[in-house]
Amino acid sequence: MAKIALPRKFFGRRTEILEPPYLLSIPKNSFENFVQLKVNPYKRKNVGLEHIFRTSFPFKDPDENFILEYLGYEIGDWECNRCGYKPKDDLLGGWDVDCPECGAKLVYKEKFTPEECKLKGLTYSAPLRVMLQLKAKTKNGYRTFPPRKVYFGEVPLMTDNGSFIINGTERIIINQLIRSSGVFFDEKEEKQKDATITRILYRASIIPDKGSRVEFELSGATDLISARIDRKKLSAISVLRAFGLETAYDILKPFYEGVRKYIVKDKYLYDAETGEEFTPEDLEHHYIFAILKFKAKIAGFGTSKEREIIEERYIEEWEELVRILDDERIEVLSVTSVPRENVIKSPYGKSLVDTLATDTSPRDADRRSPVKVPAEYTLRDYGLMEMYKKLRHIEALTMEIDSIIERARVYFNVFFRDLKRYDLSRVGRVKINAKVHNIPKVLKPTDIDLLDNLPPLALAEDYGEYKAGTRITKELLKELFKNYKEIKVKDYTEDEARFLLPIDLINILKYLIDLRHGRVKKDDIAHLGNRRVRSVGELLENQARLGIAKMEKVFRDRSATIHPEQPDLKPQDFINPRYVTNAIADFLKTGQLSQYLDNTNPLSELTHKRRLSALGPGGLTRESAKFEIRDVHPSHYGRICPIETPEGQNIGLVTSPTVYARVNEYGFLITPYRKVENGRVTDKIEWLAAYEEENYVIAQSTPTDEEGRIKAEFVLARHKNDIRLVKPEQVDYIDVSPRQVISPSSSLIPFLEHDDANRALMGSNMQRQAVPLIFTQAPLVGTGMEKKIARDSHAVVVAKRGGVVEEVDGSKIIVRVNPEEINLEDPLDIGIDIYELRKFERTNQKTCVNQRPIVKKGERVEKGQIIADGHSTDRGELALGKDVLVAFMPWRGYNFEDAIVISERLVKEDVYTSIHIEELEVEARETKVGDEEITRQIPGVPERALAHLDEHGIVRVGTYVKPGDILVGKVTPKGETRLTPEEKLLQAIFGEKTKDVKDASLRCPPGVEGIVIDVQVFTRKGGKAAKDMLAQKVEREELEALERELEKKKNLLMSGVEKVLKGLILGKKTDKDVKIGKKEIKKGTEITEEIFKEYSQYILARPENFFTDEELIKKIREIYTRSRTQIDMLQKVYQEKKETLLKRRDLPPGVITLVKVFIANKRKIKVGDKMAGRHGNKGVISVVLPVEDMPFLPDGTPVDIVLNPLGVPSRMNVGQILETHLGWAAKELGKKIGEMIEKGRDRKAITEYLKEIYAVGDENGENAKFIEEFLNSLSEEEFWSVVRDYAQRGIPMATPAFEGADEKAVKELLKKAGLPESGKTTLYDGRTGEPFDFEVTVGYMHMLKLIHMVDDKIHARATGPYSLVTQQPLGGRAQFGGQRLGEMEVWALEAHGAAYTLQEMLTVKSDDVEGRSKVYEAIVKGKYTYTPGIPESFKVLVRELKGLSLNVKCMNGEEKPCDQVEIKEEEEK
């Protein structure tokens, strides 16, 4: 049986209503949406790359001589496995595409696997080919060229575990958390001339995804509304007119009751809707606006000719209207009025009317309103003109008004009605709709007229032939209401819905006025409803869009130089296709959000891939981010972890999504809740974004009865960022799980609820720094999340399909797949799954990845079962540290200030030993003076220094190397020198120069020692390298490995075929006499094992010679045909790989050979290493004590670690104490089971005892029932194996966050284990044997060894490299630098009067170049005197002064320039 993880005793609910989603879904789904690799290229959704290409093409040049249209794209090389067909220019290869030749599905051909890319320093990518069609203008229309696939370059692909491999290193793209597009309302203090008065300015900002930012401002001082576009101030009314709210009637109607529009006939007013007659006097106490038409001159015409103009004018009194009606020169087109009383009573007050009145009031002496425009135009044109003049700084007198209006129309259409320039995006539309439009979820027949006052809507579900997402019109609704009583609707987010609409502006102004009157609150920038996640796909999409914009520019430029009548034009003639892929590749290599993957252990890898950052392009900066944005916000609940964030300047800006958080289609974080109906909790799950949950009452996870009713009379619930007690009937939703609030890292901390948040933060961060150990051990006290994290981080190997383990060793597992799971369509599926295990691989942090199988040969495995452990995992569970026996007590001052005392047992038994792998590489390059060479012949190096190198000069695997040892011998040509006659003679005889070379070997750097575990040699194929012995050796080894792989697969295939054949014919009798060579099988002979073994190949090839049963013969023939096809396919794949291997050039230009050497270093735990628990309890080892000196328990067991008890009270992380108690109980209960086995207890007694343990603290009896079912399902052998595991390891516990074990349960378990309920015991001093005065808390705690190891920190320099300019020693361990002697250190030496020491420090030990060499010579000769010279930094200072044209001379008798003079000390007289 496989080594399975023992089932944990759960203190929370064993079964969750909803399991946490796949933890890497955010980046992986985002990237899949970007490339849509697993979608048929002809059926791709309009997202990601497809969306960019569709919206950017067709390209047109200004004269429209050429049009370049987009037809589709393919990623990767595709081929038919059956007939070998490769797609031509007219077919896009891709998922689910049929081969036109034979009808089979095309298959993706991977050039290199991610593992090969890591080894060879390549980028894991696939070619992107875009199918484009060119059209060229001719006299008779357009000439269409056949479509062509254009190679756009390589697109980096995401590996299965969510990372990218760029030039051999694993990198990831961080998810960015940025402000979303949409409308935002805020308020700030308005500057007043009188500093004592403060007034508030209310602002509505409409932020699009791309394009100009439109803002409306309502002044608290004047109550007038103004607008800004890209920060430039202009009239709000002009902006409303430009967007389609043309007249006073259009603007005022949505805001006030009683707004009427009148038509004028014979000086009487008639209501435009009802036809009712009014006189001007009836409009007393009304606001009156009139549209007039008359002849006048308009400034800026350039001619004095009068034109008919129309103007809109505010008329203060009705008498003024009478005068205008009486004036025969003026034609009144329409009048709009609104009663003053209605305005005052209206919730929207006078703001809008006053703004409109101010804008249209007569201002000049001629009593003319400024709002006027020639009669052939409209008032909207006036708005467009005003907007254009302000934004483009056009003066009215400089241009004809007609041309200004024409340009203004074009300007508006380009900048506000073209998706390339202005796009609210789907997110922006959804946000605006949610904020200012009250959109019903369901429309009824009475709601048809509502459509006029709503933004565009779409069907939320399929209704007959009308699919979900179809745009709703009145006609469509009328049609649907014939068959349906109500229609579910959602936001429509395409086409004009992505522009700013008049209805948006009306509702935004309504909301702004509501904000002014305190009816609504301003927006909170930190609220997650206003912030969204830009994941990998979207970030790459933005880069690709920039590349396409450059490409379009090139298209325009090139099309100007090509004649449309030219024959044989190709898309490549017009574009530079690399822009798109180059933009993506550059972003992955150097982008702010592209980071070097932190894969110290599986948890750090998982967390890094899920990380959210508010920094990066378009985001915040560390300096500008205020406290509010960094702080925990109520909307983070269930979405962002309140605990896990870095300490330091990034605190609160870099965060982690919670266990259950997902991202919705608009990029907002969503979290699941269970629906509550009338106080009864249902199993219906709904995922809500932060902006959706505002209106609901949401309770935390609360106990319920059998019917699902909430037990408590009052429950704690959240509503609109407020927490309060409510009755169960008021609750709308309830949390899915108590773990919903925290991230995977935090969810691994047991008793999290008993830790102070600051320490929990350190605990969750330090778990990510735990080093994978050689021997792993899952924690005794866990939280139940260990398995989920191990699986989702891809550290363990999971069976892809069910089957039987055919073969297993340390490096691979071979599973013969269940027949029903074999894909018969794919000839390459031979029914065998081979899992290559990762062996001693180096991570980015130099830790070691090593996978170990946990299944045995012949064992049956199910799909999804864990079949191999990885680094830091144990039986499929995350195992970051070890459970060790700890005691909380001071020990002779050695654990002062968080220091840790450890036992020598941890060193001797390799408890905390880890492997670290150093990778060193050397290149042999082509140089101008000749080629570098990897060789054993190194000038000036004695033979003993080369003893560990092979014949090619490369270190042998298994050698123990120390700093300074040669790893790879390399020589470099020195350059051309004049040859002596002897050398010329030798050259003439042997035709080769005598080598004039210098040693450039790769040596083991300081601080690195260990065993060489692997050497990899890469040589360039072809050219000079082909003659090289080393290159031939490497090629031979690679080909042999390929052949071995082919043979292995053939053998596995044939053994599978034989098994199937055996099942068909074993025991059957032959129907004919068969003669094979000299041997003969008689008719009626039964086919036994021996006969089958000898003749199976003959039966397979010619079944008709043995049998007459047609059905049987047909089956055997099918088996034979399929096996032959598969062998042919395997041979073909081998051939392809061989060809690739023989012709490829993997190395960068100029490199002949690349050698990588991997050195493994086994590090035992030692003084100076950092250790930590899971509760933020960290410390540095101060002493390693012999086992006999450690304090010991009454039974003689010495403790492993002594921690300082003073580290607990002030830190308030009591969780560590509870973990210690529970860990002790768990271990001792295991020992009790061991005693029962020794006493020979039967299976039933042990099962009952385990049930008792598992029942502790379990109200529902779930645990006892579970363990009973589990143990009963095991065979006798499996049962005793599991029980022995319990005895050896202890009873594993799981105490999930916020529903963990309580004090009562811990005490009960301690009691059952026969331990004191206080968790304390008497300890004895290992040195004296005396008991300590007080009882001490003792128990098992999961302690981690962190990556901050003393071996990486300690550093000492004697001599080493110097800076080029100042000649001072370099700084830092990496540069093998020295210690800085700063100003304060100089003062100290001065204060002590240590003049000679100081002189030494400032001269010969630093940058006195001549003095340094003189000191060396003196020491060699045994003299210890020296003469200091001028420090180089002084000379640098002098040269810098000369650079400022200041000549400095030294006045010591010789007036030489300072950087040449020698300062001589006066000789002693």
Swiss-Prot record:
The keyword Nucleotidyltransferase applies. One of its GO terms (biological process) is DNA-templated transcription. Keywords: DNA-directed RNA polymerase, Nucleotidyltransferase, Transcription, Transferase. Pfam families: RNA_pol_Rpb2_1, RNA_pol_Rpb2_2, RNA_pol_Rpb2_3, RNA_pol_Rpb2_45, RNA_pol_Rpb2_6, RNA_pol_Rpb2_7. It comes from the Bacteria. GO terms for molecular function: DNA binding; DNA-directed RNA polymerase activity; ribonucleoside binding. Its EC number is 2.7.7.6. GO terms for cellular component: DNA-directed RNA polymerase complex. PANTHER family: DNA-DIRECTED RNA POLYMERASE I SUBUNIT 2. The RNAP catalytic core consists of 2 alpha, 1 beta, 1 beta' and 1 omega subunit. When a sigma factor is associated with the core the holoenzyme is formed, which can initiate transcription. DNA-dependent RNA polymerase catalyzes the transcription of DNA into RNA using the four ribonucleoside triphosphates as substrates. This is DNA-directed RNA polymerase subunit beta. The gene is rpoB.
